[in-house]
Each structure stands twice: as C-alpha cells, then as structure tokens.
Design a protein with these regions (language model features):
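Short strand-edge motifs at loop-to-beta-strand transitions and within beta-strands
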Residues: 1-3, 94-98
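Surface-exposed, short loops/turns at beta-strand junctions within beta-sandwich domains
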Residues: 6-13, 99-106
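Flexible, low-complexity linkers/stalks enriched in Thr/Pro that connect modular domains
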Residues: 22, 31-42, 125-134
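A structural signal for beta-strand boundary/capping segments at domain termini and interdomain linkers
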Residues: 27-30, 120-122
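Short, solvent-exposed loop/linker segments at the N-terminal edge
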Residues: 51-58, 144-150
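Extracellular acidic loop/turn motifs
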Residues: 67-76, 159-160
C-alpha cells in the first residue's frame, strides 16, 4: 500500500503509526515505523590551511569541522593531489585534523564530508610550496662615487 502526505515533509525524523481492525471490530496492536528525510548535505568548514596559501614548509595540518543535524554520523576523507582519499577521525563535536606532507609546487587538498544519507559536501584548498630562494641579479648605485650628505639611488634587481 502507498501513502502520499498532503504536504512535503520537513527534514528530520518522522513516524508513521498503523492501526488495523476488521469488520467484526477486532483491533490489532498498533505498529509504527520511523524514518528520516534528509535533503541537505552536511556542513563543512576548513579552518586551516587557507586557500591559495604560499609557504616554504612541506608539513601542514588540515583542520576543520563538520555537522549534519539529520543524518549522523558524518564521515570525512582527505585527498592530497592524485593520492587516495583517506578517512579521518571525526570527534563528537565534528572537529577533525590530519597532518599532510606537501610536495614542492602546487598541491590540491580535497576534503569531503558525507552524511549517513549519502549527501556530501566538498571543499578544495590549493597550497603552493615555494622553496626556491630569490636571486639578486644586480645592484647599482647612482651616482657612483657617492658624495657624503648627497642623495643617491640604489637599484636592486631580484628574481624569484
């Protein structure tokens, strides 16, 4: 048998109660079934690292928080570049963290939070590791020689 509610049901838990009786007035014990409606993916916020971070360090810790009011628990995976997504432990408060080792150049960190209903939220961060020191190409002083107490200009050309 099917039932269509007269109006859309809100996200959350719902219970359907069933009563049955026959023409002779014999009533069955009431039965019920509970279910959840979940149309909203979990929230996901990343507190560290910031997007487009440029650093000279290869060690970084991804930290964040997730929550889903309807379909707990929420699972979190973190993927670095083209590696495998790894499950991360999520605390009772929704907080999580994972240490990563970045490579020189551009790194893509993908964090996915997925609730028990299969809804997911994805946040991506790009972190650039720059370990190349700048190069001083030239230094000029004008005028040269410099007179004491006079104004002079020092020009420096640097590449990075």
């Amino acid at each position: 048998c099917t039932y269509t509610p007269g109006s859309a049901l809100a996200d959350g838990s719902h219970t359907v109660k069933i009563d049955a009786s026959d023409f002779d007035g014999n009533a069955a014990a009431q039965k019920s079934v509970s279910f959840k409606i979940d149309t909203v993916p979990p929230t996901l916020s990343i507190s560290s690292p910031s997007d487009r971070l440029i650093t000279n360090k290869t060690a970084i810790t991804v930290t964040g928080k997730t929550n889903d009011a309807t379909s707990s628990p929420v699972t979190v995976t973190i993927k670095l570049n083209s590696g495998n997504a790894e499950a991360v432990e999520v605390g009772a408060d929704g907080a999580f963290s994972k240490a990563l080792t970045l490579v020189a150049g551009s790194n893509t960190i993908t964090v996915v939070a997925k609730d028990a209903a299969g809804k997911s939220t994805t946040v991506t961060r790009t972190v650039i590791v720059d370990q190349t020191a700048p190069v001083i190409k030239s230094i000029t002083i004008n005028p040269n020689p410099v007179d004491a107490g006079k104004t002079y200009v020092i020009c420096v050309e640097v590449t990075d």
